[in-house]
């Protein structure tokens, strides 16, 4: 699971609502998986990133190169775009868990895939 994916996921346990974000990330296995640099894609994704959630996830993974916020004029700053490309697309959590901050529900991550399936009792009606 890439950190970009983590940044888009939230818990849909019944009664949680918007407080199910961000999911707390605990990784037991992380891999750096090189991906071709696409600056246009990163430029389009930066405004969609929930920065506080990204910083929290990066902190859990001990990624020190994550800027505290997008820099002014990032669209034209290749160094910044490459850092964000690395953090969002190349850091991959293979094994671990995601935990809902409101309900405490734990979702496993296995072979890079987060299992967000809920039982019938947990789903919203």
From Swiss-Prot:
Protein family membership: Belongs to the TRM112 family.
SUPFAM superfamilies: Trm112p-like
UniProt name for this protein: Multifunctional methyltransferase subunit TRM112-like protein
Pfam families: Trm112p
Statement: the UniProt record of this protein carries the keyword Transit peptide: no
Domain of life of the source: Eukaryota
Protein's job: Acts as an activator of both rRNA/tRNA and protein methyltransferases. Together with methyltransferase BUD23, methylates the N(7) position of a guanine in 18S rRNA. The heterodimer with HEMK2/N6AMT1 catalyzes N5-methylation of ETF1 on 'Gln-185', using S-adenosyl L-methionine as methyl donor. The heterodimer with ALKBH8 catalyzes the methylation of 5-carboxymethyl uridine to 5-methylcarboxymethyl uridine at the wobble position of the anticodon loop in target tRNA species.
Subunit structure of this chain's protein: Part of the heterodimeric BUD23-TRM112 methyltransferase complex; this heterodimerization is necessary for the metabolic stability and activity of the catalytic subunit BUD23. Part of the heterodimeric N6AMT1-TRM112 methyltransferase complex; this heterodimerization is necessary for S-adenosyl-L-methionine-binding to N6AMT1/HEMK2. Part of the heterodimeric ALKBH8-TRM112 methyltransferase complex. Part of the heterodimeric METTL5-TRM112 methyltransferase complex; this heterodimerization is necessary for the stability of the catalytic subunit METTL5.
Organism annotation: Bos taurus
Gene Ontology biological-process entries: maturation of LSU-rRNA; maturation of SSU-rRNA; peptidyl-glutamine methylation; positive regulation of rRNA processing; rRNA (guanine-N7)-methylation; rRNA methylation; transcription initiation-coupled chromatin remodeling
Modified residues (Phosphoserine): 119
Record's keyword terms, sorted: Cytoplasm, Nucleus, Phosphoprotein
InterPro entries: Trm112, Trm112-like
Location in the cell: Nucleus, Nucleoplasm; Cytoplasm, Perinuclear region
Upper classification of the organism: Eukaryota, Metazoa, Chordata, Craniata, Vertebrata
Gene Ontology molecular function terms on file: protein heterodimerization activity; tRNA methyltransferase activator activity
Domain TRM112: 2-119
Gene Ontology CC annotations of this record: cytoplasm; nucleoplasm; nucleus; perinuclear region of cytoplasm; tRNA (m2G10) methyltransferase complex
């Amino acid at each position: 699971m890439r950190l970009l994916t983590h940044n888009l996921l939230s818990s849909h346990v019944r009664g949680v609502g918007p407080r199910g974000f961000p999911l707390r990330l605990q990784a037991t296995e992380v891999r750096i998986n090189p991906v071709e640099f696409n600056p246009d894609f990163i430029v389009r994704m930066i405004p969609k990133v929930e920065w506080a959630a990204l910083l929290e996830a990066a902190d859990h993974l001990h990624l020190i190169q994550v800027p505290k916020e997008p820099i002014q004029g990032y669209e034209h700053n290749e160094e910044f775009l490459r850092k964000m490309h690395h953090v969002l697309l190349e850091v991959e959590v293979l094994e671990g868990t995601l935990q809902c901050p409101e309900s405490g529900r734990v979702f496993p991550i296995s072979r890079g895939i987060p299992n967000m399936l809920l039982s019938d009792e947990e789903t919203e009606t």
